[in-house]
């Protein structure tokens, strides 16, 4: 966590909000979400955690879903901090348009919704079995 804190504290962004979407399906995921919330808060950020409902995530990396095509500056810091903590990450841009398109095509599609004030979300899935 020291390496993560170093990255987070060095960031000079004015907007230090981060949204953690936690899959409640496994105790390990819930524990990781709580630990990340603590590290972000100690690093001077404003984390908000939400439990994912309506779907079960497959095991995989920590995913950063960016609403627009261009990443806000905070995304790079968040990604570097997660990687400094030994986590594998994937980043996807243009998620808001993708979500809306999928919902239009299939109203029953279970995706991860983004609120208007969320430029990005960090999705914490169960870790793959090694």
Which sequence ranges carry the predicted segments?
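Long, folded non-catalytic interaction modules
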Residues: 1-130
């Amino acid at each position: 966590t020291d390496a993560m804190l170093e990255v987070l504290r060095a960031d000079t962004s004015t907007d230090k909000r981060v949204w953690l979407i936690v899959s409640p399906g496994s105790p390990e995921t819930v524990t990781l979400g709580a630990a990340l919330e603590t590290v972000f808060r100690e690093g001077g950020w404003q984390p908000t955690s939400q439990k994912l409902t309506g779907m079960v995530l497959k095991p995989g990396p920590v995913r950063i879903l960016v609403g627009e095509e261009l990443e806000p500056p905070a995304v790079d810091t968040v990604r570097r901090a997660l990687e400094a903590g030994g986590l594998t990450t994937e980043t996807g841009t243009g998620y808001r348009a993708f979500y809306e398109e999928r919902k239009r095509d299939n109203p029953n599609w279970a995706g991860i919704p983004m609120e208007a004030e969320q430029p990005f979300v960090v999705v914490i899935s169960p870790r793959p079995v090694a």
